[in-house]
């Protein structure tokens, strides 16, 4: 349009028309065009999600072997207090699968310009994520082109040099070790370009997972397609699907009834649920059950303007990007409300220097809980963890690591106590969970139930001298 006006302006030698052409170009090309392009991209993705996303009857159950317990803020404190290298500092962390468990992974990168110019990344530090205790492992491996190095030795420079036409998702970068090999990896995004004639003619781009870039300590980079990365044993258990594409998919559902409805009427328009400002961001990566270890991204949504009530939980596979949704007929408690409910408990409320943070979705059977951590204000450790039932609002407060895993196996314990089959030909070892009248876990004990056998469990209250079997 602006080009046609400019041609007419030149023929008529009209300065006013030339200015009009420039204004039209700026307004349509630099303002309206990108807005229209964004709306087209979201609308296309919403249509794709409607046809591809699976509707769930039950959310993926959380892993009972690897529970995401340790908040990033406490992990950061544990990691800093374990640093023994004055010329190095910790890179920002991400979740990494290592030796059968999940950890927060930190790169050990140079801390000053001289070391960054002449030195190398020293390796990585790992903090176990599956318990409340401090468990830190340091792996010393020199990377020729590591994180935090300058100029041509930089990890970022080498990757951009190799793949200059991809968007590199540095927020997905992680250090890891598998099969005796250390490596650094991150994902990239590419774009599928389209053109739409109306109502405003515009090119637009839809993001898609481009590749996974894996760098060895020697600096060699292997660029793999998402499919190749999913089949690589080196990346087993890792999550490498881009976080921003996962969010783009869910946010696109705001456009399911059209862009005008999203902007003006807002009928059936979702919004991403609020998270407390403690370092957690959507999507939240959670270890889930399956044939092999894996992480699932969770994103909670609520109706626009509804407050803190969740009515949908979206899940995105941490490797394939496959999307699914659990819809609720009645509003569920959101993560912010779960934190509020935890802070109201007398045990937490009476603590003068503690706060409830980092709600993480945990699914046990058909029940959704928000797993909230009560930590000291200095983030020096976890005081309590709380399981907040998203349907009823009931809060179960536990202390230490063992009761967390005991809580998640309560249904299995109840099956044994009710005389149902254990489902194992050789018997089964289980955790017996003892709760008081308020539902608090006051004790746990491992027991072995023989095949076809029964076990009597006697519990004695030493205060009231009452017992039950």
Predicted regions, residues:
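Soluble extracytoplasmic regions of secretory-pathway and membrane proteins
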Residues: 1-469
């Amino acid at each position: 349009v602006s080009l046609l006006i400019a041609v007419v302006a030149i023929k008529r030698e009209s300065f006013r028309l030339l200015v009009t052409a420039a204004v039209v170009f700026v307004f349509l090309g630099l303002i309206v065009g990108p807005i229209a392009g964004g709306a087209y991209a979201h609308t296309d993705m919403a249509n794709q999600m409607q046809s591809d996303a699976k509707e769930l009857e039950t959310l993926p159950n959380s892993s009972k072997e690897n529970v995401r317990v340790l908040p990033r803020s406490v992990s950061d404190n544990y990691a800093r207090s374990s640093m023994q290298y004055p010329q190095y500092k910790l890179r920002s962390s991400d979740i990494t699968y290592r030796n059968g468990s999940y950890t927060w992974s930190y790169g050990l990168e140079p801390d000053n310009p001289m070391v960054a110019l002449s030195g190398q990344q020293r390796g990585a530090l790992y903090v176990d994520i599956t318990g409340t205790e401090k468990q830190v492992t340091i792996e010393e491996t020199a990377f020729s082109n590591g994180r935090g190095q300058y100029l041509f030795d930089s990890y970022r420079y080498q990757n951009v040099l190799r793949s200059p036409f991809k968007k590199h998702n540095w927020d997905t970068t992680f250090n890891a070790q598998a099969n005796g090999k250390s490596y650094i990896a991150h994902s990239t995004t590419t774009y599928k370009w389209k053109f739409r004639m109306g109502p405003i003619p515009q090119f637009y781009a839809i993001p898609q997972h481009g590749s996974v870039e894996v760098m060895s300590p020697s600096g060699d980079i292997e660029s793999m397609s998402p499919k190749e990365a999913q089949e690589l044993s080196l990346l087993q258990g890792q999550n490498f699907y881009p976080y921003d594409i996962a969010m783009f998919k869910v946010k696109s559902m705001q456009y399911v009834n059209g862009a005008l409805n999203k902007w003006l009427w807002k009928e059936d328009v979702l919004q991403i649920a609020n998270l407390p400002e403690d370092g957690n961001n959507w999507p939240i990566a959670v270890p889930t059950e399956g044939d092999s270890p894996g992480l699932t991204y969770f994103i909670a949504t609520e109706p626009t303007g509804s407050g803190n009530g969740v009515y949908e939980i979206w899940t995105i596979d941490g490797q394939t990007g496959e999307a699914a949704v659990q819809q609720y007929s009645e509003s569920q408690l959101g993560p912010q409300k779960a934190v509020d409910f935890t802070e109201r408990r007398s045990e937490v409320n009476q603590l003068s220097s503690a706060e409830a943070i980092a709600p993480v979705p945990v699914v046990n059977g058909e029940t959704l809980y928000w797993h909230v951590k009560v930590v000291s204000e200095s983030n020096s450790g976890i005081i309590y963890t709380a399981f907040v039932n998203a349907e009823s609002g009931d809060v179960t407060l536990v202390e230490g690591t063992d009761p967390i895993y005991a809580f998640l196996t309560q249904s299995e314990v109840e099956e044994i106590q009710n005389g149902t089959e254990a489902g194992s030909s050789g018997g089964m070892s289980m955790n017996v969970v003892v709760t008081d009248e308020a539902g608090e876990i006051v004790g746990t004990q491992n027991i072995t139930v023989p095949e076809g056998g029964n076990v009597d469990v006697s519990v004695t209250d030493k205060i009231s001298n009452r017992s039950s079997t």
